[in-house]
């Protein structure tokens, strides 16, 4: 498992073409067909929409990838009632040992350890005490590891993005359908307290008919990108040398898509991408990185701010932004608007960090704090496990809420909140932004990963209150 990004030829060619296309301006407004059309289902292959998990008395989790993200999530999995971590794996065997030590020191059973080679995860997947595989490796390995988990008969929770190519996204959909196992994007931001309250308010009609949303991942990662220890072998920085794309738009896009019932009555139809020049990383390097650092051999080609404008079948728009190269405070933007009002997150010093303006409650063109509405629309998950989340999870507790809910779904035998079709759709801007940028920002079609089932209204993150099953 090399730590060098295995960027495809398509991504590289797309980046090269983008340079020339952007110089000549945007072409025809007619959307360009996606490179891979919806493949036909094989005989016997069926949709996974509405398919519940088989009930599990205990959920046994194996973890692939024990760097910053995976290593930080293992204790959260172990803290969920009825969940145990049975095996851990990393190409660096010392990480597996440290992860096992950490779990054991907290009173958990010591998990089996795997590591030392690129195929260590395959050996781990031959165990018979795994129900769910959590994958937190570098982006370029997510598809390989997620697919292997499904083929081994396990469900998979995969960090962002689940894949970086359109054909890989389709293959994960098809593999999930053939194996009858679920693959879920580990989109913790969908379980944020503000995001879930926003979703409930939208579904209650507070904002009227929804018209547009704006989300992003705006996070100054420059210091971490140039760190010699944070991202193993600098894998994340190297993506900026090999492709021009919106690498990580899901944190901002997914909560907006969920509030708009994408794949549950609406769907994303077209995407057009724009990018700024790549300035931030080179400027940071010039000011703060010694001349003998390996990064001085690199040329950064990904724009600092990559913006995707997405249209839906119902005529809504979503703007999804990605910028990890600029000096700025953290923001996911998280803004949703409709015919009767708007909520805007990351917008001031109010306790919730969000502000709202809705008719007929407000007037005078004056924002109000979101706090009253968050209390009214507080999701049952936060009411039930919010205190535990504060003690066991990162990112304000939403990591643990995601973990708790995933385990609950599996133990109770319920339908997942986020399915493989959501996961594929929310991650599709990664490859589609490459295509759009390579064609001068022209719109490209977004595939319908549900193969027509998006018109069916069905529950998602707006779930009914449910108790965690008692211990067996």
UniProtKB/Swiss-Prot annotation:
Instruction: Quote the PTM field.
Output: Predicted to be exported by the Tat system. The position of the signal peptide cleavage has not been experimentally proven.
Write down the top EC class of this protein: hydrolase
Residues that hold NAD(+) according to the record = 68-69, 90, 139-142, 145, 159-160, 188, 248
Q: Has the keyword Lipid metabolism been applied to this entry?
A: no
Q: What does the Swiss-Prot or TrEMBL cofactor note state?
A: Binds 1 NAD(+) per subunit. The NAD(+) cannot dissociate.
Query: Which stretch is the leader sequence?
Result: 1-35
PROSITE patterns recorded: TAT (PS51318)
Q: Which residues participate in substrate binding?
A: 217, 236, 248-251, 330
By its UniProt entry, which InterPro entries does this protein fall under? Answer: Gfo/Idh/MocA-like_OxRdtase_N, Gfo/Idh/MocA_oxidrdct_glycsds, Glyco_hydro_109_C, NAD(P)-bd_dom_sf, TAT_signal
Co-factor requirement: NAD(+)
Keywords of this entry: Glycosidase, Hydrolase, NAD, Signal
Question: Mind telling me which Pfam families this protein's record contains?
Answer: GFO_IDH_MocA (PF01408), Glyco_hydro_109_C (PF21252)
Known EC number(s)?
3.2.1.-
Q: Which GO terms describe its molecular function?
A: hydrolase activity, acting on glycosyl bonds; nucleotide binding
Functionally, this protein is described as follows: Glycosidase. Has no alpha-N-acetylgalactosaminidase activity.
Q: Which family does it belong to?
A: Belongs to the Gfo/Idh/MocA family. Glycosyl hydrolase 109 subfamily.
Q: What is this protein called?
A: Glycosyl hydrolase family 109 protein
Organism for this UniProt entry: Streptomyces coelicolor (strain ATCC BAA-471 / A3(2) / M145)
**Lineage of origin:** Bacteria, Bacillati, Actinomycetota, Actinomycetes, Kitasatosporales
């Amino acid at each position: 498992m090399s730590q060098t990004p295995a960027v495809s030829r398509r991504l590289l060619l797309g980046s090269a073409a983008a340079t020339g296309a952007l110089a000549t301006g945007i072409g025809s407004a007619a959307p360009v067909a996606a490179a891979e059309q919806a493949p036909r289902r094989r005989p016997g292959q069926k949709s996974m929409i509405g398919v519940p998990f088989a009930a599990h008395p205990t959920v046994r989790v194996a973890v692939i990838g024990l760097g910053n993200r995976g290593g930080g999530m293992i204790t959260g999995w172990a803290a969920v009632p009825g969940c145990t971590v049975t095996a851990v794996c990393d190409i660096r065997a010392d990480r597996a040992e440290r992860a096992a030590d950490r779990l054991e020191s907290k009173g958990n059973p010591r998990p089996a350890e795997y590591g030392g080679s690129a195929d260590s995860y395959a050996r781990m997947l031959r165990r018979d005490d795994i129900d769910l595989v959590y994958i937190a490796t570098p982006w370029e390995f997510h598809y390989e590891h997620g697919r292997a988990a499904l083929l081994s008969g396990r469900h998979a929770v995969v960090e962002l993005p689940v894949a970086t190519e359109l054909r890989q996204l389709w293959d994960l959909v098809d593999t999930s359908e053939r194996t009858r196992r679920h693959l879920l994007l580990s989109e913790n931001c969908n379980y944020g307290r503000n995001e879930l309250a926003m979703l409930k308010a939208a579904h209650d009609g507070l904002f009227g008919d929804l018209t547009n949303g704006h989300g992003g991942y705006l996070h100054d990662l420059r210091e971490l990108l140039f760190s010699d220890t944070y991202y193993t072998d600098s894998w994340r920085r190297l993506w900026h040398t090999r492709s021009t794309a919106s690498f990580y738009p899901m944190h901002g896009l997914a909560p907006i898509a969920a509030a708009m019932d994408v794949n549950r009555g609406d769907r994303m139809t077209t995407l057009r991408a724009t990018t700024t020049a790549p300035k931030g990383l080179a400027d940071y390097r010039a000011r703060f990185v010694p001349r003998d650092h390996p990064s001085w051999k690199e040329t950064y080609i990904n724009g600092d701010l990559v913006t995707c404008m997405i249209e839906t079948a119902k005529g809504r728009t979503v703007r999804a932004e990605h910028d990890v190269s600029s000096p700025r405070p953290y923001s996911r933007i998280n803004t949703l608007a409709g015919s009767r009002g708007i909520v805007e997150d990351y917008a001031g010093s109010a306790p919730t960090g969000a502000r709202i303006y809705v008719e007929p409650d407000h007037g005078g063109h004056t924002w109000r704090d979101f706090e009253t509405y968050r209390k009214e629309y507080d999701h049952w998950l936060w009411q039930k496990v919010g205190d535990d989340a504060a003690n066991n999870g990162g990112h304000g507790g939403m990591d643990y809420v995601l973990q708790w809910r995933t385990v609950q779904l599996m133990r109770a035998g319920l339908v997942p909140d986020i399915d493989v079709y959501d996961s594929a759709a929310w991650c599709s801007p990664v490859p589609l932004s490459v295509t759009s940028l390579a064609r001068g920002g022209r719109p490209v079609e977004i595939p319908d990963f549900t193969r027509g089932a998006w018109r069916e209204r069905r529950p998602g993150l707006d779930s009914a209150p449910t108790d965690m099953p008692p211990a067996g």
